[in-house]
Each structure stands twice: as structure tokens, then as C-alpha cells.
Amino acid sequence: MIIRSPEPEVKILVDRDPIKTSFEEWAKPGHFSRTIAKGPDTTTWIWNLHADAHDFDSHTSDLEEISRKVFSAHFGQLSIIFLWLSGMYFHGARFSNYEAWLSDPTHIGPSAQVVWPIVGQEILNGDVGGGFRGIQITSGFFQIWRASGITSELQLYCTAIGALVFAALMLFAGWFHYHKAAPKLAWFQDVESMLNHHLAGLLGLGSLSWAGHQVHVSLPINQFLNAGVDPKEIPLPHEFILNRDLLAQLYPSFAEGATPFFTLNWSKYSEFLTFRGGLDPVTGGLWLTDIAHHHLAIAILFLIAGHMYRTNWGIGHGLKDILEAHKGPFTGQGHKGLYEILTTSWHAQLSLNLAMLGSLTIVVAHHMYSMPPYPYLATDYATQLSLFTHHMWIGGFLIVGAAAHAAIFMVRDYDPTNRYNDLLDRVLRHRDAIISHLNWVCIFLGFHSFGLYIHNDTMSALGRPQDMFSDTAIQLQPVFAQWIQNTHALAPGVTAPGETASTSLTWGGGELVAVGGKVALLPIPLGTADFLVHHIHAFTIHVTVLILLKGVLFARSSRLIPDKANLGFRFPCDGPGRGGTCQVSAWDHVFLGLFWMYNAISVVIFHFSWKMQSDVWGSISDQGVVTHITGGNFAQSSITINGWLRDFLWAQASQVIQSYGSSLSAYGLFFLGAHFVWAFSLMFLFSGRGYWQELIESIVWAHNKLKVAPATQPRALSIVQGRAVGVTHYLLGGIATTWAFFLARIIAVG
């Protein structure tokens, strides 16, 4: 740590009334661009309007102005999020069976959407139990509400109104901090202050207040609910907060107040701050006392972290010093210059944030089922499948976004003149070695992973099961994964005092947990089938990385187009007269990367869906016999391509295909419609621009003949626009098809 003389006092960091509020200006389409503001000559105008409306770099090159626009837009985003949350809570209050579900969560399904019988579509209101008819929801909101101690629909109403107030507040803040008091550039670049506020404020105090809420409100209310007390009889949250004796009846140490804390007799608090591991056998969720303890610990860590950086007082770390000291023996200048990059290029900053948030989202997907945090979440199979799928897709998109903004940084913000021998420069100088090695890895993984399946299909087709790779013939056991599982299964009692079970039941060792005759979780066995599909995961992920990384490393120049940086982030080809230079822009790499991201995530969610139905989810008899949904067929069926097609896609599609005439029929329509949207995308992806331009000119001729030709000239989509429309419909169609397939299946059988 470097101790310096105090920094000069903070200057005034806002400009007053920098930009007037003008509805006349905003009402003019394309007011942000001289060219677009002139109005349309051709139909390309509307596409350019959409492409550039939020590309603040194209409006101005003034970093301060760009920063203010981004900052203001963030408040708008928060406003929309609050509005959405309010809608969710309002549906819970107005259209849901939450109170009924709360009284019997094992036999009643969650529903917060009731279809109005306008054209006879009330068939969609299925019987979710308890005499309620509505659409079964799979968002997990009911489970979150129970975990946070919400016991009535009135409380949901109040929260919904509160969220609306916050939405309005955020809208106001977005306007205020752009038009009335706009921060100066120095404020956006003061990273130490930002770290202090975000770490100590958002994460530290945020976690602390959540831990406080859990201890004082959630834990007592959930204890009553678990004991079967009628929600209407349970004291209201404010009674627990104001009346300590009420809590002391449940947790005797509350009678002593803060004395044990100040006398360091902290073990007194172990009644409500536990470290048990495993799941609560009543609800099938993590112990809420473990979760409260976790948030308290996280709060302490982040409150400390928030005090590590040097601001107005001359004590603490400076980010620039940390980065410039970050040198290894083989990395030249190391991170020198990175501080300047990250404080002047928001694309570089965003790229890092997206990569980390995307990875974190995928980590969340894997923890939601292996350590289900909310009561009765683990036995709600449709919600479990939805949460996993949702977080996987979101994580995939965020990671592709990271590559997109890294490439935009390279094209727009990277200045090669003052970068020499730092880490980025060194990576760029040996990019050929990186990409060619990565390419070799992809070829190796592709041939070998698919080769194992093709071998199995061939042996199966020839009637030679003894020569297949399977748990019953030639075994390829995932020994490293099994070793990790065993290590974790044996960990309790060694890692933390009082820990009675491992972090997740999936590791093994523990008994299964069942709630209301349904399996919540049990040790997940891994075998040859998992080994095979794991290598498909490795293959698809490496190909996605190859495409995205090549796009970033060759964004500015390549042997084919040495001056690529001058052509920008997205361009169709390197001008006329240079054949073979189309589809090489950084944008095109993002475009291609999206398809492989889609491949990668699809295999993951298919693996998860089938594995859980085969080896985890199911019912348990009074004698303790478990019957899985697909009877454990994953290990023997998923080892051939044919098995995936026959026993997963075809066999499990029967529910969505046969859904007509039932309350699941909307999924049947979506399944059909989303296939159509997906097929529609191929029209854009498989045909060239000239084809459409010729067609349009014939159609324009016909319009002229009839004297109904429009003033705005029709134009075919540009190459880049066509590919953008194509990939959008491809992903939208593919994801919605998967959604309908998964939900119709799991709601019917789960």
C-alpha cells in the first residue's frame, strides 16, 4: 500500500442545465444524425434509424457526452426493470392463487395468469389444484415470495405499488442527470470512488440489509409456515421487527440482544446463523438459516472491500498503481496502459463486465438446481427446468456480447501508437499462433467427440452392443468428475464445524430428499453417457470461442485486409474489385458466433433436461422406491445420435405435439409458430441481396403501372441488415421452439 499526501479536495463534478429539454427535437425522427434527420429517400432509412439510434459513438465523439447518455439510459433501463417487477407482483396480487399455494405447495401448482374468454381461449386455464384454474407459471416467483416472508396478496399489492414509485423515480433521475445536473467526465472516470460505493454500498449494505430482513422477517415467518400455521395467523413482518419478545420465543438468544456480539460470544447466534449444508427436508430448499449466514458473511467481506481504495484521504490502493505493478517475468509491460483503456473506452469496460456477468449467470444456472435456494423450488420441476434454461441462454448471449464490444473497442477505441509490449499488444502479435492452435483443438474435439457417437451408432446398427462405449460394454467413466464428486461428498465435518451435509446433495454420499412424494434432489451418478456429451460441450464451447476470439484479434487488420480498422466494425466486403473479402468484419464474427453459441447452449439444456428426468426427478413410494420420469434411460439411450433423436427429441415431443384440445395447447401453437419463425430466418440467410433487389424492381414496375408507387424508394436490405434479420429470427424461433417443447413436456409429466 502506498501512503501519499492527501489528494486535492473533490471539485464540483456536475454541469448545471447543460442540455435543454425539448419535445420538438425528440419528435423528429433521427434528430441525433444529420443524414437521418433529412428524412427518408429510400426504405434503407428506417433500418439506419434503428441501427444508429443507440449507437452513441456515431452521434458525437465527445466522451463526456457519450458517458452522460449511457448513464441516463441506465436509469431508463432501471425504470423498465421496476415496471416489469411491479407487473410481476401485481399479477401475484390480482390474478394468482398465491395464498392457496402457500397453504399447500406440494399439491397446488403456481399460477398468476388467468386467460380471459374473449374468443374461446379459456381452455388454456388448466386446473392447477385447489379449485383454481389458470396458466401454470414457471418463473419461481412464488418460491421467492415465500422465502422472503410474503404471506398475503395485500403485501404483493403494496410491493407492486412501491416498484411503480421507484420506476417513476428512475425515469426522473434519468432526465435529471442528463438535463439538469449532468456529471462531468472526471466523475465517470473516478474508479476508486465508484468501487467504494459499489462494493460497500450496493453489495455490502445490500447484502447486510437482506441478511437483516431474512433474520428478522423471513426466518420466523418461514418457521411458522413450515410448522403448518395458517398464513393468516402468522404475525405481520413489522410485529417481528418491533417486538423482540416475539422473536425470542422462536430464537431464545434474541432475548440477549446485541450483548453476545460485543462480548464476542458469537456462538449464541448459531440458532439462526447456521452452517449446516444440504437441504431442509420439509421444503427441499437450502436451510434459510444457512442463507442468512451467507449474506451476513458476504456483507462483511464487501464492506471491507469497499474500504480498500484511495479516494479523498491519502490512504488505500490506487487502481492505476495495482495495474501497472501487474507484471510477470514473461509478459513485458504487463497491464501498463490498461487503466487508460478502461477509463476512456466504455466498450472495453463493458466487454469485461459482460464476460464476467455471462459466466456468473451460467454459474447461477448450475447452482439453482444443485443448491435450490427457495422453499419448494426443487420439487417444482417445470420451474427448475425453466430457470436452468433461462440462465443458460442469458449467459450465452452476454458472453457473445462481450466479444462484440471487445471488437468494437478494437476498431473504435484502440490506439496502437501508445501501446507497446503490454499484454494486449503481445496477444495481438502472436494471434496467429493462438487462433491456429485453437482451430486445431476444435478439429480434434469435433472429430473425437462425434467419432465416439458415430462409433456407437454404427455398432448399434450392426447389432453389436458389446462393442459400444457404454457403462455395460467398453466403459469410458468420467473419473476426474467422479473424484471431484467424492471429495465434496466426504467434505462435511472436515471443512466447517457443525456442517452436517455437503454443499449439494448432487455430490453423492447423502440420502435423497423428497417432499410430498416427489424427489427434490439426490446424488447424481455420472457415467459413460455424461463423458460423451461432456466432450460435445467442450467442442461447441471451443468453436464459439474460436469464432469470437478471431473476430476480436483480427478486428483491426488481417493478412487479407491489412486496413480493416478503416472499414469499421461492420462492413459487407472490402469494396468492389476485391473478391473473397466479404463477411470478414468484426460484426460478421459476432453473427457467426451467435449460431455456435446457440448450438452450445442447446446441447447443454438438452443434456440437463434428459439427465434430470432420467436420473433425478420422479416420485417416491411409501416403501422408499424411486420411479424416475423416464426410468433412468439416459445412460443407455443418450450414447448414440439415434438415441438422442428417438428417445429424447421424438419421445418427449409427444406432449407438445398432442397438446391440442388441452390447457397446454398454447404450447402446441407456439411450437408450430416458432418453427415457422425459424424457417423464415433461412430465407434471409440463404439468399443474396441481388435476388431481392431484382424482385423489388419488378414489383416497383407493377406499382408504377398502376400509379400507386410510393415516394420512398424501396430497397433490398443491405447484406449486413439481411444477416441481422436472419440471425434474430433463427435464434428467436429456435429458443421459442425449445421453450414450448420443454414446458409442454415437463408440465404434463412433472
From Swiss-Prot:
Classification via InterPro entries: PSI_PsaA, PSI_PsaA/B, PSI_PsaA/B_CS, PSI_PsaA/B_sf
GO terms assigned for molecular function: 4 iron, 4 sulfur cluster binding; chlorophyll binding; electron transfer activity; magnesium ion binding; oxidoreductase activity
Record key words, sorted: 4Fe-4S, Chlorophyll, Chloroplast, Chromophore, Electron transport, Iron, Iron-sulfur, Magnesium, Membrane, Metal-binding, Oxidoreductase, Photosynthesis, Photosystem I, Plastid, Thylakoid, Transmembrane, Transmembrane helix, Transport
Catalytic activity: reduced [plastocyanin] + hnu + oxidized [2Fe-2S]-[ferredoxin] = oxidized [plastocyanin] + reduced [2Fe-2S]-[ferredoxin]
Cofactor note (record): P700 is a chlorophyll a/chlorophyll a' dimer, A0 is one or more chlorophyll a, A1 is one or both phylloquinones and FX is a shared 4Fe-4S iron-sulfur center.
Signal peptide (from-to): none
UniProt-annotated binding residues for chlorophyll a': 675
Annotated residues for binding of [4Fe-4S] cluster: 573, 582
Biological process annotations from GO: photosynthesis
Gene3D superfamilies assigned to the protein according to its UniProt record, in alphabetical order: Photosystem I PsaA/PsaB (1.20.1130.10)
Binding site residues for chlorophyll a: 683, 691
Pfam name, any one: PsaA_PsaB
A GO cellular component entry from the record: chloroplast thylakoid membrane
Keyword ATP-binding: no
EC number in record: 1.97.1.12
NAD among keywords: no
Entry's localization field: Plastid, Chloroplast thylakoid membrane
Annotated phylloquinone binding sites: 692
NCBIfam families given in the database record: psaA (TIGR01335)
Homology family: Belongs to the PsaA/PsaB family.
Known function: PsaA and PsaB bind P700, the primary electron donor of photosystem I (PSI), as well as the electron acceptors A0, A1 and FX. PSI is a plastocyanin-ferredoxin oxidoreductase, converting photonic excitation into a charge separation, which transfers an electron from the donor P700 chlorophyll pair to the spectroscopically characterized acceptors A0, A1, FX, FA and FB in turn. Oxidized P700 is reduced on the lumenal side of the thylakoid membrane by plastocyanin.
Protein name per Swiss-Prot or TrEMBL: Photosystem I P700 chlorophyll a apoprotein A1
The encoding gene: psaA
